[in-house]
Each structure stands twice: as structure tokens, then as C-alpha cells.
Amino acid sequence: MAPRGRKRKAEAAVVAVAEKREKLANGGEGMEEATVVIEHCTSURVYGRNAAALSQALRLEAPELPVKVNPTKPRRGSFEVTLLRPDGSSAELWTGIKKGPPRKLKFPEPQEVVEELKKYLS
């Protein structure tokens, strides 16, 4: 039997993902204002409903602040809210990745995130 060759597709995929993240990070440097990013898993509708409710609450409290939902492909089981600042830094307002089961522990109350956002903006 012939020797098996090394798989090169996995290495290329890792490099492509790293380049994509770097490009997104560099693209974020030119922002003029802060942005709220909500990343949620797409495997279940519960994540989407909670993300929609949270984005609506954020838009009501800070209408001048843009809110993006899943700008990139989300991680499995994730629910994160991040504030991207104009200087390129980011502040995590909520992460539910390590929380649960039960799944409801992954989702914050919208008011908690709004209060956290106000702390970072002031």
C-alpha cells in the first residue's frame, strides 16, 4: 500500500481564517463611531429571538449607536455582545459561551446589557 500524504486543506483553511480575521480587524480601524456587535448561534431560533430583542432594546436606549447582528459567521453555541470602539479596541458586554446548560443562562436580560453599555460609553 502506498504511503498516505499529508492533508494540506486543513492548514490552508486555518491560514484563510486567520487572514479573514486580520482583514476584519484592519477594516474596523477606520470606524468613526462605536458599534455594538451581537454574535449568536444560528442552530436554534431561540438565539435569534433573544438577539432581536436585545438589539431592539439597544437601539431604543442608544439610537445613534449602530448595532450589527452576526457580521461574520458565528461560533456554535455562542451568544456574545461586544462594543467595538473607534480606536480599534473592543469591550465585551456579555458572553454566554461558557454558560449553560440550561440554555436560558446564555442569554442576558436586555436591561443588564444596556447598563453595561452605558458604563463603557461614559
UniProtKB/Swiss-Prot annotation:
GO cellular component assignments: Golgi apparatus
InterPro entries assigned: Selenoprotein_Rdx-typ (IPR011893), SelWTH-like (IPR052674), Thioredoxin-like_sf (IPR036249)
Cross-link entry Cysteinyl-selenocysteine (Cys-Sec), positions: 41-44
Modification N6-acetyllysine, positions: 20
Keywords, sorted A to Z: Acetylation, Redox-active center, Selenocysteine
Pfam families, sorted: Rdx
Coiled-coil segments on the chain, per record: none
Stored Gene3D superfamilies: Glutaredoxin
Keyword Metal-binding attributed: no
Domain of life according to the entry: Eukaryota
GO-annotated molecular function: RNA binding
Family classification: Belongs to the SelWTH family.
UniProt cross-references to NCBIfam families, sorted A to Z: CXXU_selWTH
Function text: May be involved in a redox-related process.
Protein name: Selenoprotein H
Source organism per UniProt: Homo sapiens
Gene: SELENOH
